[in-house]
């Protein structure tokens, strides 16, 4: 049963920069102990392999090398930030750097995660850099890694991308999503349909399905028709907006604390 299929305006994703994608360009294997190995299909954007619009799997050269080695990327504890501490720095060229300050304060005040200014003692760190898109790798990659931010990306988008850097995937890509949502691929440009593939998680899905997660796509993500591409199969809780970028939900906090106990 579909709960909501109303016509609504398409969210202006150009402002956030989270939905800059392209045609499918290839695939890479990723896996976990809990769910085995799965193939992720990605788009080639700015010489990067981009998954689901804003997740950086690596450079195209890195992906090509991985494919030649027939390797599988195993996600899990190795990609966690030790002691839940994430050193960061901000590129001086980043427009509106206060949004990073606000996003850091949001994570630090609501979770046990601590984003701290980078010092010379920090070999692994995140650097916030200007870009035409907003995107991040998932989890700690080692050395310097970037969170790219579009010029108009709001604080909520910064919080979202920081969630990826911590190790959180998109909520609507959970293993159990079919019980809660239906995806209308007929309303999505065929070149962008790969963005709705389900990922391989690095553990069991945490808690109940969270429509209000800051890690959830908005209902009209990648829509070409003005109608929802993500439809609820169960009632969305009162006051909850699918795809909101206002604040971490209780479910987001729980997920962060589960992978950083």
For the regions a protein language model found, what residue spans apply to each?
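Zinc-dependent metalloendopeptidases
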Residues: 1-261
